[in-house]
From Swiss-Prot:
Disulfide bonds: none annotated. This is Chromatin structure-remodeling complex subunit rsc9. GO terms for molecular function: DNA binding. Keywords: Chromatin regulator, Cytoplasm, DNA-binding, Nucleus, Phosphoprotein, Transcription, Transcription regulation. GO terms for biological process: chromatin remodeling; regulation of DNA-templated transcription; transcription initiation-coupled chromatin remodeling. Belongs to the RSC9 family. The modification Phosphothreonine is found at residue 230. Residues 530-609 bind DNA. Component of the chromatin structure remodeling complex (RSC), which is involved in transcription regulation and nucleosome positioning. Controls particularly membrane and organelle development genes. PANTHER family: AT-RICH INTERACTIVE DOMAIN-CONTAINING PROTEIN 2.
Length: 780
């Protein structure tokens, strides 16, 4: 196929008038067109088992305005799929769109829109299928204009002369007089020989054979290829930096358009992909955000035009929103808290929000302060950030109060110098106490968290108890110890056997641990030491219990014997808690006894008759009666050591001669008719061994005994607990605040007034019973 490339094309190149059938003609044109572009085509595509006529598909899409118009409509391709009678139009719509884009989109651009086609790699073979027409128009606008006098190349197979070839390179109307002379010279040179042909040939035209250039020659392809080339844009094809790096650089530039662009992207990323938004991956981004926030706040204070102030505040709000979204993650909160100038920038932002009365900006700043306050260290009560927060304690807005109270409580928790929360006015504390009476759970929890940190200082506690609001606070704390309590029932089984005596708590006057075992326990750390000590001195028993005060006093006496007084490594409340770790069924609870209406006990354990070692071996006392009538009483670890002790210290030949057993109150005596012999000695020694306890020989000979029993359901009011059964939530915080008040100088007087009410609460709510036990132990 030969063509003449001219400035304008009057009729479509791909036309075939010999074809009468429209569909066949269209398929022939499309197939020829695709071969020219070098793109494979399937002229009979199918969706499922139903064939799709490309001609019908093309007409329907063009009728609706083209590919982009159909794709912009929500159900555009679905409606076309319905017209093709597809069983599942919604599913077939995507397949139909894919068929059109692969086989017909280039024909639409060429035939319908009459635009220059880009390469197949950027059109039908591209993954980008949006705004196709706009991208092609941009491609056409970037192409260089065609020259006014294009070179015309004519395919001529009849002549090979230089004259014909030269005429094919120029227009006929451009020949002038000089060209005519050249033509005449060329005509005459054909009939006359050349003088000095060797030198003349080297100075005139070279004797190179010339051949006609067909249309599909290399020169024609080079001209076609270079006619569409455009100079590459600056930076085209170079992979730029990551998005977050560009955002950080845009923030550093402090140019308004760049900052607006960066803020827009960061707001979207921090909201939609907050789980992947890690500031540690780009360390400079957190610093840029904090610095940009301070820059916009400072700029808003310096400008005077209302429009400029509004623009600066909008940018500051956007940056604060990004920081607020990011610090919801613990890792990001730690990273932002370690950023320089974050405290001063937050203080300036809070005061700026108050100055311009911008509540949205203020809430974002307070949220940021709340989330990072756990990792901040404010060690001076004159810190401007701390003082700015204290100004909000008189606010009537609950949302501002909640954020402020939580932030101050967390700052006080990290206060190493004990300087914070000690310069607050009495009216501020009275307002916070009044918040405890509200029905808002969030404000009550925030107020209790603040009061817990506030009452850890003794001076604050003394001032609080001396105020008029003290008893109102105590009443509310006792009420909140049962906050949202739910009724539960505990089943207790009591055996109804007459042979068994009534269950009593174990006395604490049994044999104490030897000093060598205490030395091993002292080398351990709490709470492992307490757990090991309980297992050495007590054993599980579902029918017994031990008073909490007795077991604590016994532990204190053993530790004082081993390491001296006032060196306890665990508090009474924590000691009571670890009982459940030492024994699975041990529970701290309250019971009624004939002596007292309420007794704090540990149910499910009893005192061992003889203690065991840390490794679990049982100690046994030597009960051999001496000549003075007293028992030896030495503790020995295990039966073999006790047997060796008897042989070495007590069983002498004189004892064997008497034939009497002197073990405690044993009356055994060998009956012999003859003088003492080895047989009588053996009988006495065999009898003495029966007094020695051997764990390995213990067996159950009577089997299980069934006895009638009674079950009692004890009603309880249980508040919120965690997975391990420990108290949590408002009830726990209220109990801890009350415990701090009881520990003060006026604590005994306060506890004596509320003791009955607190004991009643602890008997109904076992979750707070360990903390009430600590209050009781503190009064001893």
């Amino acid at each position: 196929m030969s063509q003449v490339i001219q400035g304008a094309v009057e009729e479509p190149v791909y036309s075939n008038k010999s074809l009468t059938n429209e569909n066949d003609s269209f398929l022939s044109l499309i197939e020829s067109f695709s071969q020219e572009r070098g793109v494979p085509i399937d002229i009979n595509p199918k969706i499922g088992r139903k064939p799709i006529l490309l001609y019908e598909l093309y007409k329907k899409v063009i009728k609706r305005g083209g590919y982009d118009a159909v794709s912009a409509t929500e159900d555009g391709w679905t409606n076309i799929a319905e017209e093709f009678n597809q069983s599942d139009p919604a599913r077939s719509a995507g397949i139909l769109q894919n068929v059109y884009f692969k086989y017909l989109i280039s024909w639409e651009i060429h035939d319908h829109w009459h635009l220059l086609l880009p390469p197949p790699s950027t059109l039908e073979l591209s993954e980008n299928r949006q705004n196709v027409l706009e991208r092609v128009k941009v491609f056409n606008s970037c192409s260089p204009p065609k020259p006014t006098n294009p070179i015309t190349i004519i395919d001529n197979d009849k002549t090979h002369s230089f004259k014909k070839f030269y005429k094919s390179l120029v227009k006929e109307d451009e020949e002038n007089g000089i060209e005519k002379k050249i033509n005449e010279a060329m005509n005459s040179s054909a009939s006359q020989p050349l003088p000095n042909s060797t030198n003349f040939a080297s100075t005139t035209f070279p004797s190179v054979p010339f051949h006609p250039l067909p249309v599909d020659s290399g020169l024609q392809k080079y001209i076609d290829r270079n006619s569409n080339l455009t100079p590459p844009a600056l930076g085209a094809g170079v992979p730029g930096p990551p998005l977050l790096v560009r955002v950080a650089l845009a923030l550093k530039s402090q140019q308004d358009k760049e900052v607006d662009w960066a803020i827009g992207h960061l707001i979207k990323i921090s909201f939609e992909r907050h789980q992947e938004f890690k500031l540690e991956r780009l360390p400079s981004l957190a610093e840029c955000l904090v610095y940009s926030l301070g820059f916009q706040v400072t700029k808003a204070k310096q400008v005077s035009d209302l429009t400029d102030i509004s623009l600066c505040m909008d940018r500051a709000i956007g940056i604060a929103l990004v920081l607020r979204n990011s610090v919801l993650s613990v890792e990001n909160a730690k990273h932002v808290a370690q950023t320089k100038l974050v405290i001063s920038v937050l203080e300036a932002s809070i005061r700026c929000a108050k100055t311009f009365n911008n509540l949205e900006f203020l809430h974002y700043c307070l949220d940021i302060s709340e989330m990072i306050s756990s990792y901040l260290h404010v060690e001076d009560e004159k810190n401007v950030f701390y003082l700015a927060l204290c100004e909000f304690l008189n606010s009537s807005d609950y949302s501002i109060l909640i954020a402020t109270l939580r932030t101050l409580a967390r700052l006080a928790l990290n206060d190493r110098n004990n300087r914070l929360l000690q310069d607050l006015k009495s009216n501020v504390i009275a307002n916070i106490i009044a918040l405890v009476e509200t029905d808002n759970e969030e404000i009550v929890a925030a107020a209790l968290d603040f009061l817990y940190q506030y009452t850890t200082y003794r001076t604050n506690t003394s001032n609080l108890l001396a105020s008029q609001e003290a008893w109102m606070l105590v009443d509310q704390l006792i009420r909140l110890m049962m906050y949202q309590a739910q009724e539960r029932f505990m089943t207790v089984t009591i055996e109804n056997s007459e042979s068994n005596p009534a269950v009593k708590h174990e006395a604490t006057s049994s044999i104490s641990l030897p000093m060598e075992e205490l030395q091993q326990l002292v080398a351990m750390r709490e709470p492992e030491r307490s757990v090991k000590w309980m297992r050495c001195c007590f054993e599980p028993s579902s029918d017994d219990y031990v008073l909490q005060t007795d077991i604590w006093q016994l532990y204190c006496s053993d530790m004082e014997r081993a390491q001296g007084p006032n060196v306890m490594g665990i508090s009474p409340a924590d000691f009571i808690k670890v009982s459940s770790h030492a024994f699975y069924n041990a529970r701290a609870m309250t019971v009624s006894t004939p002596q007292l209406p309420v007794e704090y006990v540990i149910n499910g354990i009893k005192r061992r008759k003889f203690p065991t070692s840390v490794n679990g071996m049982r100690y046994q006392p030597c009960r051999w009666c001496l000549d003075s009538g007293k028992e030896c009483g030495e503790l020995l670890l295990g039966t073999p050591l006790l047997h060796s002790h008897l042989q070495e210290m007590h069983i002498f030949p004189q004892i064997l001669e008497t034939g009497k057993c002197r073990w405690s109150d044993c009356k055994y005596e060998i009956q012999r008719l003859t003088p003492a012999s080895e047989l009588s000695h053996y009988q006495l020694l065999s009898h003495i061994v029966t007094h020695l306890h051997d764990d390995s020989l213990e067996t159950l000979v009577e089997g299980r005994k069934l006895s009638p029993s009674r079950e009692f359901r004890i009603p309880l009011l249980l508040t919120a607990v965690d997975d391990q059964g420990d108290a949590t939530g408002i009830a726990l915080t209220a109990t801890l605040v009350l415990r701090n008040l009881v520990r003060s100088k006026q604590g005994k007087m306060l506890f004596s007034a509320i003791e009955s009410r607190v004991l009643e609460v602890s008997s109904l709510n076992p979750a707070v019973a360990p903390y009430v036990s600590e209050m009781l132990l503190g009064q001893i």
